[in-house]
Each structure stands twice: as structure tokens, then as C-alpha cells.
């Protein structure tokens, strides 16, 4: 579910999309799976001179994302007292959409 939510947010991430639209795409996947109450933060935030900066992909941000922004893509589900899952990548917003610049593999490894 978290991976599907991340993919939905990434698909929406592009210059001109608002932070709320990007967050909403991911949040819908999580809510539709029954975990909406357990996603308590925004989809992502700007990464630059500081690790957390503008622009943010959150429900409150109605500003359009600028071309050239670098943002995190980090949806998560956290079940109190049990466990949490978060997948975090970094996106570069280009004129054509976005590029996921994180090169870590996404396949599930069972050890």
C-alpha cells in the first residue's frame, strides 16, 4: 500500500501541480486501503540547503510546484504500538514531469 501510494504521488508530481494535489494522490491510496488515519504527515518536502524546506507536498499547500524543485516522496503508514512503514525517494521536478533520482532497488528482499 505504501509503495502504491508513493507511485501515485510521483505520478502527480510535476511543475504546476500543487503540494495538496500531490499529497492527495498518495493519501487517497492509503485511505482507500483503510489506513487513512495512520498517515499523519505530508507526502514530501523540499530538499536543498536544508533537508526540510519549501516547497512541501502537504494538504495545506495550494501553491504550484516550481520547475527545478527537488522534493522528497515519503508516504508512510504507522500503526501505534506495532510498526510503521515509510518509503522515501527524492524527486527532481523537470519540464517534462519529474525524475526519481533515488536509485535504490524497490524489490522486496526476504532474508
Can you name each region flagged by the protein language model?
Residues 1-111:
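Active-site neighborhoods and metal-handling regions in enzymes and metal-associated proteins
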